[in-house]
């Protein structure tokens, strides 16, 4: 049977970091999947502040990780620790790289590579889903279910967006061949 655990501060911070991160993924996905959303100011405003929201997501994730390490006193010399927490650690490392390069100087220096580097955010999205399922399923709080719902929704939006973009590309190529 599913046991619902009490809500702890690290869990609250984890879910808050997750939803803040999801907000950074929304603008592009909304604009492609729901073209009528362009008329509203929501995607535009989210796009305008996306870097700052992403940095906030990183800082909240940092607090989440810090509190968990202190609370559970992990043995970092044990390989099982890395195996169990690999998805969370990998997504955290991706967030570190994205946060460090979320400035105009990095955009100018990295040029096309900056955009490629920031495509890692989609890997983090899948890793976070794995992290939530792997570490929380079976003993999570009600916040865990909100997190699972949120990350699943953004993954579905992303997959739909990729499908729409692939279809548009296919039509474009067919027009060029004709």
Predicted features along the sequence, with ranges:
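Membrane-embedded alpha-helical bundles that constitute the cytochrome b-like, heme-associated redox core
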Residues: 1-178
């Amino acid at each position: 049977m599913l046991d619902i655990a009490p809500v702890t501060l690290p869990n609250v911070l984890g879910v808050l970091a997750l939803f803040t991160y999801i907000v950074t993924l929304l603008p592009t996905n909304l604009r492609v999947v729901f073209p009528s959303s362009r008329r509203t100011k929501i995607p535009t405003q989210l796009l305008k502040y996306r870097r700052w929201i992403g940095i906030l997501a990183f800082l909240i994730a940092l607090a989440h990780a810090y509190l968990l390490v202190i609370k559970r006193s992990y043995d970092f010399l044990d390989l099982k620790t890395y195996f169990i927490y690999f998805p969370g650690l990998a997504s955290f490392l991706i967030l570190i790289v994205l946060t460090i390069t979320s400035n105009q100087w990095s955009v100018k220096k990295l040029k096309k590579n900056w955009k490629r580097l920031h495509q890692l955010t989609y890997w983090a999205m899948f890793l976070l889903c794995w992290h939530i399922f792997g570490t929380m399923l079976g003993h999570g709080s009600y916040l865990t279910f909100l997190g699972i719902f949120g990350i699943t929704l953004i993954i579905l939006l992303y997959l739909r967006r990729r499908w729409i973009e692939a279809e548009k590309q296919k039509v474009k190529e067919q027009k060029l061949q004709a």
